[in-house]
Amino acid sequence: MNTQQLAKLRSIVPEMRRVRHIHFVGIGGAGMGGIAEVLANEGYQISGSDLAPNPVTQQLASLGATIFFNHRPENVRDASVVVVSSAISADNPEIVAAHEARIPVIRRAEMLAELMRFRHGIAIAGTHGKTTTTAMVSSIYAEAGLDPTFVNGGLVKAAGVHARLGHSRYLIAEADESDASFLHLQPMVAIVTNIEADHMDTYQGDFENLKQTFINFLHNLPFYGRAVMCVDDPVIRELLPRVGRQTTTYGFSDDADVRVEEYQQVGPQGHFTLLRQDKPAMQVTLNAPGRHNALNAAAAVAVATEEGIDDEAILRALESFQGTGRRFDFLGEFPLEPVNGKAGTAMLVDDYGHHPTEVDATIKAARAGWPDKNLVMVFQPHRFTRTRDLYDDFANVLTQVDALLMLDVYAAGEAPIPGADSRSLCRTIRGRGKIDPILVSDPAQVAQMLAPVLTGNDLILVQGAGNIGKIARTLAEIKLKPQTQEEEQHG
């Protein structure tokens, strides 16, 4: 970026010129890293800390950011402001040091709000589908030549990054309700995909509190802004009279303003018709599987149509959509050792979904696209509180696969909760008599324990939000073949 471009960007918020060095605590998180990437490209000095390297920290280092793989007071030296993720506790040494040095400490969403303040902000909120919908909106705007800035919670595969600095007035961002910090945002357009009980510790266990927080978020829209909401969701339908802003609805429902009809899935693609008020019907080919992704696309089309984007650009973007990292992410199809004398293959798919509704949508997409496959899931529950609160829902959803391997709960810093562990969940599922789940206590043994349940015509879903994505990549690297101890040592 040249000096003139940088000066123009910094003039958006003149007071931000006083800020030179921005430090991120928990910089390896996708949402944090995305904002850091945009700011690095705007010319700010970026530093950050996390516990281990990952693709996000590697990308930031390539842009000149200083990354510390520890949390020490000296890491915040000379910082103008410290940005923290919701996963960081208040007693973190860097946060304590920043307070002592009277350095401002702000949450991620506050910095995102500053980026959005004088841009045309499009914020995508909801319990499920935020990341993919953000990527779809970004892809359509890019295809239309509008050069948007985007900040996403997952890797946008077409761009190879979580975030990108554009040179237009548009900023498209995923809005995080997990800590209610999306209330800092003041977008021009807001999408709400759905509302379900999740992150309930933030909302004192009160679902009414969660619903009111979404209403408060929508009230951050100016009176001339627009809410785009999925009317298929019963909670959203209930809340519509309280929105108080111009609203476009979408869904499979007959009364949706943007309506999905005639949905069919063929392999990884969805084919459907979109009906819009006072507009020609669109015949859509979407390069993403599942009815849930048709809904995500309908939301993106609703926003793009309101902006006046050409239908041909919309259709091109959806047909060529490359998806996001760890969202029904196809890692390969691998040959297997002959089973009963017959050679076969197994497809490997990595998916981030960790709420029962998300897991259910992934299973349905797999069944619809590959109905003859033996569906095997490797599942890692995420957080003891979520496992406890949604225990029966998990048990019901996970019985839909043909074979299930379950890893221990990924704690994400939580203390264990009796009865909300993987062993208990396996026992409950087994008691329902549909499948016999296998508990895998050692992640290194996944490939070995997979082998006996494969038939030679398999689709393996590696599912969860913890560190299970690394297991998926390892399975792809070894091509699903169990390794000997010697191979593991030399791998």
Curated annotation (Swiss-Prot):
Recorded family membership: Belongs to the MurCDEF family.
One example of the protein's molecular function in GO is: UDP-N-acetylmuramate-L-alanine ligase activity
Q: Which InterPro entries match?
A: Mur-like_cat_sf, Mur_ligase_C, Mur_ligase_C_dom_sf, Mur_ligase_cen, Mur_ligase_N, MurCDEF_pg_biosynth, UDP-N-AcMur_Ala_ligase_MurC
Gene3D superfamilies in alphabetical order: Mur ligase, C-terminal domain, Mur-like, catalytic domain, NAD(P)-binding Rossmann-like Domain
According to the UniProt record, one GO cellular component term is: cytoplasm
The record's PANTHER family line, in alphabetical order, gives: UDP-N-ACETYLMURAMATE--L-ALANINE LIGASE, UDP-N-ACETYLMURAMATE--L-ALANINE LIGASE-RELATED
Q: In which pathway does it act?
A: Cell wall biogenesis; peptidoglycan biosynthesis
The subcellular location is: Cytoplasm
Role of this protein: Cell wall formation.
Q: Report the EC code(s) recorded for this entry.
A: 6.3.2.8
The main place the protein resides is cytoplasm
Species for this entry: Citrobacter koseri (strain ATCC BAA-895 / CDC 4225-83 / SGSC4696)
Reactions that this protein is recorded to catalyse: UDP-N-acetyl-alpha-D-muramate + L-alanine + ATP = UDP-N-acetyl-alpha-D-muramoyl-L-alanine + ADP + phosphate + H(+)
Highest taxon of source: Bacteria
In this chain, ATP is annotated as bound at 126-132
Please provide the record's keywords in A-Z order.
ATP-binding, Cell cycle, Cell division, Cell shape, Cell wall biogenesis/degradation, Cytoplasm, Ligase, Nucleotide-binding, Peptidoglycan synthesis
Pfam families found in the cross-reference section: Mur_ligase, Mur_ligase_C, Mur_ligase_M
Report the enzyme's class at the first EC level: ligase
Write out the GO biological process terms. Answer: cell division; cell wall organization; peptidoglycan biosynthetic process; regulation of cell shape
Q: What is this protein called?
A: UDP-N-acetylmuramate--L-alanine ligase
